């Protein structure tokens, strides 16, 4: 048993987006002969269609590899692949909790970027052994010496420890594998102690129920064992355990340090919580493993099925997605404009887009989503404090004492020639300048405190387009601050459309109102009658525009003839339109709900 544990190595790969993490994982699978040449395809571990299309990793993945070192020792590796995007930090923290080591991949041409730093700090918090790798050294623009110096200066990593590699050209992979055997510690844990296994992910299979991905920290688990979930106290009998070599391979038993899966006829999605500890029902562990901190969503939006009959299917889809995405939150809500739907909370805009696309693809439900918003703290004149994530629920301005909004600390890394544009964008977004550090002759780290509601819209897009794509960006919540905010309502044909309401700073309200009214005028199709589009704060209209009516030429059949006859027909048409306007309702396309997002600041 001791021998079994001695040669297990659990590690993950951390990197900024596009620094070659998934390609390196592919090479490691190839070089350890885990996957044959015939089965190999790019981004092998990114199983979701979405991941392959966008070229990003969204879900973490775990694979078992067998490796024989140059000294002839046999090892079992567990590689846990992690996402690099700021929205998926929780996926990274979950996978790092199951490891003892991390390969830090840095692009030889790009150098250290904001999310590289964020992930390294996470790894250091988890006391992981870090193996630094400079990737893409075969690129013409590679500057390995500069990147080595950056690693030394910024992260305090010894330049001599850095492995130079190119995952694409298969350079340095062997050295990385050898280094893992030398420096990554074996999993600490007692094989004879009561079982403690951490659930770090799970998915739902309609035949087998919930499949839990587990990392065994102490004890062992085999088919037929009675297990208990420590958070819920529910008991189950294990009917299958196994590991992934990306394909699932059934095993008799999982030991200390193993990363694999188990099924136990768990039919209810809520019974297998990510971050929970599994133990034996008849020989319980004294205390649960420290799980994951529950992440609070930062961005909210309404999701409504286009076809109202899909409402229950949408609930089921959200339940399934919540199973392995613990940061997704949702609750039912109704809108006068859109009917029944859900108010959903996400970690960021990319997270929101991905969930929306997964619902549309995997469950075939057409959605209308409203523009995203954040949680505002509203203090009323009677002292009551409300947390409001839906702008249409903002109380009347007369009863509001003050509104506080969430602020984030934004860390922006950028080449020094673009510091000007970055500061300009940040100031425009109501940011407060905090700090600026030169990492070397070329790269600058700029820190701002910015309201989250400004970042939610198009901050990242503007940052990228004004720095030719060179800026990288990471942010974390720092708390709430009072701001002079107002709720803006949009009226179509005199009716308030609740799903189009948004919260805006009073200084920009007039300008924003004008922009959105013009935008909606372009997006909403012309009706048979004239439709006024208005933006209002409370009872005060701040902007208005009219969508002109489509006019049928009623006089076409007249030939020459009398002007009074013409007038009579036009009067008759006008009467008809008046009637229609009273009963007419305006069709609003999906683009109109997102118009709030696409405001150009020019």
From Swiss-Prot:
Its main location: membrane. It is a peripheral membrane protein. It catalyses: GTP + H2O = GDP + phosphate + H(+). Its EC number is 3.6.5.n1. Residues 6-188 form the tr-type G domain. Belongs to the TRAFAC class translation factor GTPase superfamily. Classic translation factor GTPase family. LepA subfamily. This is Elongation factor 4. The gene is lepA.
């Amino acid at each position: 048993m001791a021998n079994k544990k001695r040669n297990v190595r659990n590690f993950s790969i951390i990197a900024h987006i596009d620094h070659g993490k998934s390609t390196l994982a592919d090479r490691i699978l190839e070089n350890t002969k885990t996957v044959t040449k015939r089965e190999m395809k790019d981004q092998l571990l990114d199983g979701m269609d979405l991941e392959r299309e966008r070229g990003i990793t969204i879900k973490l993945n775990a694979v078992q590899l067998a490796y024989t070192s140059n000294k002839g020792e046999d090892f079992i590796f567990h590689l846990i692949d992690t996402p690099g995007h700021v929205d998926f930090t929780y996926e990274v923290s979950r996978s790092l909790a199951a490891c003892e080591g991390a390969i830090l991949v840095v692009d030889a041409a790009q150098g250290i970027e904001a999310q590289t730093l964020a992930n390294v700090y996470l790894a250091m918090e988890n006391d992981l052994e870090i193996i630094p790798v400079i990737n893409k050294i075969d690129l013409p623009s590679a500057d390995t010496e500069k990147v080595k110096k950056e690693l030394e200066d910024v992260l305090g990593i010894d330049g001599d420890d850095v492995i130079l590699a190119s995952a694409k050209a298969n350079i340095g992979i062997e050295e990385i594998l050898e280094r893992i055997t030398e420096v990554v510690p074996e999993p600490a844990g007692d094989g004879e102690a009561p079982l403690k296994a951490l659930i770090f992910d799970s998915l739902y299979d309609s035949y087998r129920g919930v499949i839990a991905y587990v990392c065994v920290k102490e004890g062992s688990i085999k088919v037929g064992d009675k297990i208990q979930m420590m958070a819920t106290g529910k008991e189950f009998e294990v009917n299958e355990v196994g590991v992934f070599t990306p394909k699932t391979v059934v095993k008799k038993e999982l030991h200390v340090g193993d990363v694999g899966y188990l099924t136990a006829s768990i039919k209810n999605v809520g019974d297998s919580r990510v971050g929970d500890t599994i133990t034996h029902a008849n020989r319980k562990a004294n205390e649960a493993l420290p799980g994951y901190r529950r992440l609070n969503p930062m961005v909210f939006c309404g999701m409504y099925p286009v076809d109202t009959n899909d409402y229950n299917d949408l609930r089921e889809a959200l339940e399934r997605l919540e199973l392995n995405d613990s940061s997704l939150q949702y609750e039912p809500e109704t809108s006068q404009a859109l009917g029944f739907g859900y108010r959903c909370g996400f970690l960021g805009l990319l997270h929101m887009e991905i969930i929306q696309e997964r619902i549309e693809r995997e469950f075939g439900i057409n959605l209308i989503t409203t523009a995203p918003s954040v949680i505002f703290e509203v203090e009323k004149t009677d002292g009551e404090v409300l947390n409001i994530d839906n702008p249409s629920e903002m109380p009347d301005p007369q009863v509001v004492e003050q509104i506080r909004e969430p602020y984030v600390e934004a860390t922006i890394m950028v080449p020094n020639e673009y510091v000007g544009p970055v500061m300009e964008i940040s100031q425009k977004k109501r940011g407060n300048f905090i700090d600026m550090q030169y990492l070397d002759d070329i790269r600058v780290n700029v820190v701002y405190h910015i309201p989250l509601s400004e970042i939610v819209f198009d901050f990242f897009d503007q940052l990228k387009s004004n720095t030719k794509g060179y800026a990288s960006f990471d942010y974390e919540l720092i708390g709430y601050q009072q701001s002079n905010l107002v709720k803006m309502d949009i009226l179509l044909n005199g009716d308030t459309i609740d799903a189009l309401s948004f919260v805006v700073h009073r200084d920009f309200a007039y300008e924003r109102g004008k922009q959105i009214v013009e935008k909606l005028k372009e997006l909403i199709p012309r009706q048979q009658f004239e439709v006024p589009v208005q933006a209002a704060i409370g009872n005060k209209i701040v902007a208005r525009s009219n969508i002109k009516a489509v006019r049928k030429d009623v006089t076409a059949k007249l030939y020459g003839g009398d002007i009074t006859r013409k007038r009579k027909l036009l009067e008759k048409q006008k009467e008809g339109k008046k009637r229609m306007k009273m009963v007419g309702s305006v069709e609003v396309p999906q683009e109109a709900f997102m118009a709030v997002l696409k405001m150009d600041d020019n």
